[in-house]
Amino acid sequence: MAKSTVYFTSELTPEAVVKMYRQLGIELPGKVAVKVHSGEDGNQNYLHPEFMKPVIDAVNGTVVECNTAYGGARNETPKHIELMKKHHWSDLFDIDIMDAEGPDVEWPVENGKVLKVNYLGKNIANYDSMLVLIHFKGHPMGGYGGALKQLSIGCASSAGKTYIHTGGKVTDQHILWENCAEQDTFLEAMADAASTVAKHFAGKIAYVAIMKNLSVDCDCCAVAEDPCMNDVGILSSLDPVALDRACIDLVMNSNDPGRDHFMERVNSRHGTHTIDTAEALGIGTQAYELVKV
């Protein structure tokens, strides 16, 4: 497979997000879903909607999210809608909680390592294309949160998230934690789920990753560590595997004093196994060329 192109700028402004999307040379057709992370109630690190507004406006997109599979402000639709208001997403954009009403859509996983099916909020079927906006950071379970997590856990319904976390055992969030899969099985299930979304929107999906507020914890954490590294910049690609690999490499190759703390989180969770599995599933390559913009 030829190398994928990943664009990079150290500029960190709302306008730079638009520039990095435009760099990809793709016009997303039809009705555009924009996948964001709405940020758990109490989290201080999530990227605010004002930062994303120019690029979401540029694609005339609808902000999409799905309910979570654990306690908090986002595991049920009424609470999630209130959270979207509190965090001002609803003030600026059309919002779609894709699994607000059932039934979920079920997309088959081709040659899945763990899963045979992925459960997603049914409204995902209403969109022609997708812009995936990624706040790259650490994650307490996945090691890191990047493009592959946005495609998998991010687009899965509450039941689908449970299914991924349990390696295909159960879909009921109330019995998730006693059914958690082994770590590598969970990571492989994430890659399986990510592959269904990447393939569904093939040729009509773009990824922009923002390396800012680099905490070892995800935006899904109500209580999260403060950022441990300086901000890095913005990356974009049409390849989610290359993009995640490039983000990890930028952390690993930096001389930032917080690098080792961040990478300990990634490595202790075997985080890059998700990237390896996604590459094996054929949705991208870890061979990339970083083009500075």
Language model features: what each stretch is:
Residues 2-53, 58, 62-293:
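Extended, low-polarity segments enriched in aliphatic/aromatic residues
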